[in-house]
């Protein structure tokens, strides 16, 4: 499969706004990006969505039956519904009929399907979800991982997260020399719980990881770090808190601006600024999180994703495929491969 024409399997039935917004984002991606899109799901619903967006061009549809609902336990759901859209999409990658999967559906089901269908990369004990957030420096983002795949971690897992994050930052985000930090309660090497202390020692000894020290919560969005490593419990809380703060900030601006600068006139003048602020803070701009460490490219988008977010998720998938992120991770892990033993 050529790097300039990646084939992306899109779970058309996953997400709060499926299939309409999923299809809309996929159609735009096919038109504007050098990708082939395979829409996976109910053919009738997908055809209806394509027609709704006045798109008469032929698009490849891969039939699937059903979806893993949000209330379902992930592992039992994917085993009970082998023809569910996320399972079919993952199988396309496994069988080399697609290069990547994009899904805004049940994130737990997507992770479980990826592990069962694609498997882990050699040398990776626990895959991680990487999420990209904006920073105070315009045009610069920070990659945080893990943000939900592993609530309990060992130091060795965090070392692997740091390796994967370094590669992602270099080849997908375009950072020549990523600065990697360990999320902690203080900058000093002696700070933190047992996991943080032992992880710090491992990271500073690994010459493949450009580790620069601990990152406090206030540093996350400062632009000081390109990659921040933490366990999935802390990372998930951090991610959702950051999203909530962004939404609150935008809402406050919407409410307060009409009260000053002569009301509606002032608001109209500031609309371009507000649009730029929203663009910098909106998670839709980054498309979703890349599940790093599985034998394939898998983008897990926000459940509330609409067309712009799906478009960006497909763009992200294409970049990961074109830059051979999975192969680069596997090559790096060969150089530091050590079995995980109790306590590490």
From Swiss-Prot:
rRNA processing as a keyword? no
GO BP: fatty acid biosynthetic process; phospholipid biosynthetic process
User: What Pfam families does its record include?
Assistant: FA_synthesis
The pathway this protein participates in, as annotated, is: Lipid metabolism; phospholipid metabolism
Entry similarity comment: Belongs to the PlsX family.
Q: Which HAMAP family match?
A: PlsX
Q: What is this protein called?
A: Phosphate acyltransferase
Q: What is the organism of origin for this protein?
A: Cyanothece sp. (strain PCC 7425 / ATCC 29141)
Classification of source organism: Bacteria, Bacillati, Cyanobacteriota, Cyanophyceae, Gomontiellales
